[in-house]
A protein has these predicted regions:
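Histidine-centered phosphotransfer motif of kinases
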Residues: 83-91
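Membrane-anchoring alpha-helices and their flanking helix-loop junctions
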Residues: 1-78, 95-154
Length: 154
């Protein structure tokens, strides 16, 4: 499997999981869905994640690509959101997914969220192997910058 086809596979699977997380039917549960307060908190978290996603997209500039394979004429971005985490787009998706989980209040979303987290972790490892080949400075950037979750107090 080529890097491009592997990247396309990861992206397709990512969209399927996001679709399932957001649009899967809300199954009836004997425990009910989220309370109004928890649902409201979930929606607020989705809004925060959406803002993070927008800033992450903008921060990549011309290096933005839907695939985990770096653009041929792209540059290693280590400023803005990328100074806090190596994969702020994935972080934003995880934040938004957590908000969806809270808003939904049903166990199927928890399972899909865990699958999405596992996929994004695998996709990030693949992407980082390609970034290391393309950008010699990536190793030192990776040593000082967390993968998904920003360090507190930094």
């Amino acid at each position: 499997m080529t890097d491009k086809s592997r990247g396309l596979f990861y992206v397709a699977l990512q969209f399927i999981l996001i679709f399932l997380l957001v649009l899967s039917p809300r199954m009836e549960s004997p425990y009910g869905g989220a309370s109004e307060v928890v649902g409201t908190i979930g929606v607020a978290i989705i809004a925060i994640g959406s803002g993070l996603l927008l800033f992450s997209f903008l921060g990549l500039g011309n290096s933005l690509t839907a695939l985990p394979t770096p653009k041929e004429k792209g540059q290693l971005v280590t400023t803005g959101m990328y100074a806090r985490v190596r994969h702020p787009i994935y972080f934003a998706l995880l934040v938004m997914g957590f908000g969806v989980m809270l808003d939904a209040g049903y166990w199927p979303q928890v399972i899909v969220y865990m699958l999405l987290f596992a996929l994004l972790s695998t996709k990030a490892e693949f992407e980082e192997s390609l970034l290391r080949k393309k950008y010699p400075a990536y190793d030192s950037y990776a040593l000082k910058t967390p993968r998904f979750f920003p360090r507190l107090g930094r």
